UniProtKB/Swiss-Prot annotation:
<dbReference type="Pfam" id="PF24877">
    <property type="entry name" value="ILV_EDD_C"/>
</dbReference>
<dbReference type="GO" id="GO:0005829">
    <property type="term" value="C:cytosol"/>
</dbReference>
<feature type="binding site">
    <location>
        <position position="119"/>
    </location>
    <ligand>
        <name>[2Fe-2S] cluster</name>
    </ligand>
</feature>
<feature type="binding site">
    <location>
        <position position="191"/>
    </location>
    <ligand>
        <name>[2Fe-2S] cluster</name>
    </ligand>
</feature>
<dbReference type="GO" id="GO:0000287">
    <property type="term" value="F:magnesium ion binding"/>
</dbReference>
<feature type="binding site">
    <location>
        <position position="441"/>
    </location>
    <ligand>
        <name>Mg(2+)</name>
    </ligand>
</feature>
<dbReference type="GO" id="GO:0004160">
    <property type="term" value="F:dihydroxy-acid dehydratase activity"/>
</dbReference>
<dbReference type="InterPro" id="IPR042096">
    <property type="entry name" value="Dihydro-acid_dehy_C"/>
</dbReference>
<dbReference type="InterPro" id="IPR004404">
    <property type="entry name" value="DihydroxyA_deHydtase"/>
</dbReference>
<dbReference type="InterPro" id="IPR056740">
    <property type="entry name" value="ILV_EDD_C"/>
</dbReference>
<dbReference type="Pfam" id="PF00920">
    <property type="entry name" value="ILVD_EDD_N"/>
</dbReference>
<feature type="active site" description="Proton acceptor">
    <location>
        <position position="466"/>
    </location>
</feature>
<feature type="binding site">
    <location>
        <position position="120"/>
    </location>
    <ligand>
        <name>Mg(2+)</name>
    </ligand>
</feature>
<dbReference type="InterPro" id="IPR037237">
    <property type="entry name" value="IlvD/EDD_N"/>
</dbReference>
<comment type="pathway">
    <text>Amino-acid biosynthesis; L-isoleucine biosynthesis; L-isoleucine from 2-oxobutanoate: step 3/4.</text>
</comment>
<dbReference type="InterPro" id="IPR020558">
    <property type="entry name" value="DiOHA_6PGluconate_deHydtase_CS"/>
</dbReference>
<keyword id="KW-0408">Iron</keyword>
Amino acid sequence: MRSDNIKKGINRTSHRSLLRACGLDDNDMKKPFIGIANSYTDIVPGHIHLKDLVQEVKEVIRLEGGVPFEFDTMAVCDGIAMNHEGMYYSLPSREIIANTVESMAMAHQFDALILMPTCDKVVPGMIMAAARLNIPAIVITGGPMMPGKFHGETVDFINVTEAVGATQSGKMSEEDLYELERCACPGAGSCAGLFTANTMACLTETMGMSLPGCATAHAVSDKKVEIARASAKKIFTLLENDIKPSDILTQEAFENAIKVDLALGGSTNTTLHIPAIANEVDGVDVTIDLFDKLSHEVPYICSIRPGGNNRMIDVENAGGIPAVMKNMESILNTDCITCTSNSVKENLEKVSDIDYNVIHTLDDPIRTEGGIAVLYGNVAPNGCVIKQGAVNEDMLVHSGPCKVFNSEEECVLAIENDEIIDGDVVVIRYEGPKGGPGMREMLNPTAAIMGRELFHVALITDGRFSGGSRGPCIGHISPEAAEGGPIGAIENGDIVSINVKERTIKLELTDDEIKERLSKVKPVERNLKGWLKQYQKLATSADKGAILK
């Protein structure tokens, strides 16, 4: 056992002495040590229930003959960190989480890992660590939040963000906004639509790192407890058969994840997180070009908020990710091994009772292309991304005058002052991995635009978007402004033309004009210290997953 490195032999006497201080006895020293990375915290709705859920996991580990060791790692709620300086820390937290889990597992030589994340950066951060460590591991994602009810309508967190703009523009009363605030988020779980957290949970299940049904089993459900207990039992199968993340996280498994992502119309943040996870696995190559290549091949078959009206509970009731994968079986790599110790094909054999009104077949798609597209052009020579599944057909092609801002705050103020009108192309720059730093989410600007019913405004940025953003929002523009990217040359009144169908984004200037402007640009300087200063020095471009180098 790997844990023998800290508990076996005379040279480990002092180590055992410390373990005995933790309550272990002679019999425990013969058992496998199972590390449990728990991201419980009191301030993140997606994580508040993990304190209780982990007790179920520990109980099963003891029953199965192991010794559970719970340790904590951080979790940031992007909704609470939104639209202030806290959002600079959200994406960088992914690296801290990965490093924390790696450090704990190496320092204490766990034989296997159970990972318990829920929200946006915690899921990829933990899987990045599992891939680095390459010891048997299984993921128990915390599960979605139930939606709320407001005046008879089903609502979620994004309804609240957009309602702020509606209230500021006189389309909603403050009394109704207050009522909505109180009922939209009724309890534990990740926000109720297919936003980043739930997208990553779905892809974790697709890749085979969590048990079938885990992603859509809601946080407050008995099913989530059952899956948590089953996962704790399954870790021993993985340990006994030496099935490691490198056996599961293959090139084919990543391609399956991207295909399901495209079929669901998932968050554009997956174009950061999936390449970042893949970067930790030898022999795997995942780029944003792969997303776009597959987007031409994989149809959009399940319309979920923010791209549609369904929420995660509807997907759960329709059969969950097993049903989605069953409908896609003909285009998936079904020989991939999963944490069940069986293949994808074997996992799907008994899947039935699919609600085809929610999860369409490949022959009856909602749209013929996948939910994410990658655009190129003189604004983004290295690419940028758009969730085309959440864009109205009439905005897939758009050309308009630019309103340019060097920060999210400047843009939000302009929207609140009614300076943005239909037809505009809003440009927010110096919000990339290095420029922010930290590549903040632009949910407040997009929600403010939608709340004001400015449905013919496009927004482009070297920052990123919440999984809850909808409309013609183009992010991850690479290279970013802080790295001398052409987005830094755009001026108020310039025309930018977007054609999602042709995958192009163009600033209507010549190459020489852009070069001349860039030669005169004075980059925005940030007064940084601490972790953000370190992150800025190490962060790579969005088209590389914003990983650290």
